[in-house]
């Protein structure tokens, strides 16, 4: 299966898309055993290629033992991008997708997306907030926007699995005006898509966001503000219905921190 949009639909018409993908050269961002991420130029524009080369038996067994479906190709990200676009969540724009092969160990697939530039990750944008607090209006605006995006994502049946502020890109220029605010969520290759997001996967995304925001100087009031927008209900009701989430957020965020430090990430 191959699906191409412009300009690839014209440039690669009548050609083997997989052969064309293999010819692409550029800046390698990540090189793993089963996945390669490359930024390249085409007709004066910048794009990203993610090339998946099946998976390993070890990875399949590890995921199945954890009751998770392993990532077998680029299809998850392609479908997640389109589902998010349908529900009004800004994300990457996919212009090319292809997959071939039935054996999960050898299946090949690719996804090509437009390079979102100029942008800055929220991790970098907020990096000095703890020592150089932002305009309170801007901070509240960003908190509300991310909360709305994550709520829409979960309502659409998608959980990210790597839901950290580094995967939310703020489009530039941004001078603090709400009418110019645009944030796109990226890196959806591990996303899961269902009719409804199970509570435990919803909580994993929320705890991931909390963990990745721990060092940017957010106050307890900022966290409550996020939760009120995300859950769409008064704080008193959230505290009653979501006590389990609140109890385990700090504990699990600390575990993520320890695991991240152990892996040297």
Curated annotation (Swiss-Prot):
Transmembrane segments: none annotated. Its EC number is 2.7.1.235. Pathway: Bacterial outer membrane biogenesis; LPS core biosynthesis. Keywords: ATP-binding, Kinase, Lipopolysaccharide biosynthesis, Magnesium, Nucleotide-binding, Transferase. It catalyses: an L-alpha-D-Hep-(1->3)-L-alpha-D-Hep-(1->5)-[alpha-Kdo-(2->4)]-alpha-Kdo-(2->6)-lipid A + ATP = an L-alpha-D-Hep-(1->3)-4-O-phospho-L-alpha-D-Hep-(1->5)-[alpha-Kdo-(2->4)]-alpha-Kdo-(2->6)-lipid A + ADP + H(+); L-alpha-D-Hep-(1->3)-L-alpha-D-Hep-(1->5)-[alpha-Kdo-(2->4)]-alpha-Kdo-(2->6)-lipid A (E. coli) + ATP = L-alpha-D-Hep-(1->3)-4-O-phospho-L-alpha-D-Hep-(1->5)-[alpha-Kdo-(2->4)]-alpha-Kdo-(2->6)-lipid A (E. coli) + ADP + H(+). GO terms for biological process: carbohydrate phosphorylation; lipopolysaccharide core region biosynthetic process. It comes from the Bacteria. One of its GO terms (molecular function) is ATP binding. The active site is at 162. It holds the Pfam family Kdo. NCBIfam families: PRK15123.1. Kinase involved in the biosynthesis of the core oligosaccharide region of lipopolysaccharide (LPS). Catalyzes the phosphorylation of heptose I (HepI), the first heptose added to the Kdo2-lipid A module. Belongs to the protein kinase superfamily. KdkA/RfaP family. This is Lipopolysaccharide core heptose(I) kinase WaaP. It comes from Escherichia coli (strain K12).
């Amino acid at each position: 299966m191959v699906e191409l949009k412009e300009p690839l639909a014209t440039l690669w018409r009548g050609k083997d898309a997989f052969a064309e993908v293999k010819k692409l050269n550029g800046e390698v961002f990540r090189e793993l055993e089963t996945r390669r991420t490359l930024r390249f130029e085409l007709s004066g524009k910048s794009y990203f290629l993610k090339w998946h080369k099946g998976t390993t038996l070890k990875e399949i067994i590890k995921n199945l033992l954890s009751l998770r479906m392993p990532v077998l190709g680029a299809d998850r990200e392609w479908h997640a991008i389109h589902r998010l676009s349908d529900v009004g969540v800004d994300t990457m724009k996919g212009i090319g997708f292809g997959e071939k092969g039935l054996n999960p160990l050898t299946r090949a697939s690719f996804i090509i997306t437009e390079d979102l530039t100029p942008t800055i990750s929220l991790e970098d944008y907020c990096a000095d907030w703890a020592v150089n607090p932002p305009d309170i209006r801007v901070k509240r605006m960003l908190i509300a926007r991310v909360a709305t995006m994550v709520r829409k994502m979960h309502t659409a049946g998608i959980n990210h699995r790597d839901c950290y502020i580094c995967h939310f890109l703020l489009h530039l220029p941004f001078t603090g005006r709400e009418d110019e605010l645009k944030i796109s969520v990226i890196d959806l290759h591990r996303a899961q898509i269902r009719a409804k997001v199970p509570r435990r996967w919803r909580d994993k995304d929320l705890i991931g966001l909390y963990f990745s925001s721990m060092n940017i100087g957010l106050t307890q009031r900022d966290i409550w503000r996020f939760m009120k927008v995300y859950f769409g209900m008064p704080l008193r009701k959230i505290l009653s219905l979501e006590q389990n989430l609140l109890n385990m957020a700090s504990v699990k965020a600390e575990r993520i921190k320890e695991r991240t430090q152990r892996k040297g990430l």
